Regions:
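RNA-contacting regions in translation and RNA-metabolism proteins
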Residues: 1-47, 55-82
Length: 82
């Protein structure tokens, strides 16, 4: 069964030009909430966020829907560059 981090990695790496440079980490925030941190190279940031943030919004929607199926109440997604 695919976990939240693996699912997020699958989605983001399928978008990126260089999938080996993508890192995904998960942190507990509260009892029922998690923080997913997606770390991408600077040159991939525009591709991951998309025009007007549409790709980032779609990623957030898919990840939150997946988390809901795993009985997680709230998931926050951060996208950072290095």
């Amino acid at each position: 069964m695919m976990g939240l981090v693996e699912y997020t990695e699958f989605l983001v790496k399928s978008i990126a030009k260089d999938p080996d440079m993508i890192k995904v980490q998960c942190f507990d925030s509260d009892e029922d909430s998690k923080i997913i941190e997606i770390i991408v190279p600077n040159e991939e940031m525009a591709r991951i966020i998309g025009a007007g943030g549409k790709m980032a919004t779609a990623l957030r929607t898919l990840i939150q829907a997946y988390a809901y199926t795993k009985n997680m109440k709230k998931v926050r997604i951060n996208i950072d560059a290095f």
